[in-house]
């Protein structure tokens, strides 16, 4: 799975897997001056597996910025960014509009605080950014540069584990 593909410089994404109520980010991507078509080509090349002589992508689902459904002036041919994700054989998971930044931040922080979001040591930038990022200073240049990978983390976390998700009863005891 991957996410956030519509910032141009850099275009950022995270590669992750989920298991139950846990999400693990295994890689981070920042590509300067990239478009969605190039990002998807990069993802397909970097995260493929060959079985019985047939290549498969290990990335099947993408949780992008919701604005990618509109036609893009940066996308070749005026096609939407979602078009290029689907052309790469991936499913797009995005709601009609992006969740509020605070909601994404709360979803990420909630999972981190409960040990349900883990990040590979390989993701040095993301780990550093999460420690340094400050919502109140988000428009300062150093904070803005960090926001791309943070957004790439926030979109899938909020989509899959929103802070307002109803609680699930895992077991009933004593009845």
Spans of features found by a protein language model:
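Mg2+-dependent endonuclease catalytic cores in nucleic-acid-processing enzymes, primarily RNase H-like
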Residues: 14, 19-142, 163-164, 169-175
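Short, hydrophobic alpha-helical segments
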Residues: 156-164
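Structural motif
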Residues: 142-148
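A short catalytic or substrate-binding loop motif that flags glycine-/basic-rich loops and adjacent residues
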Residues: 5-8
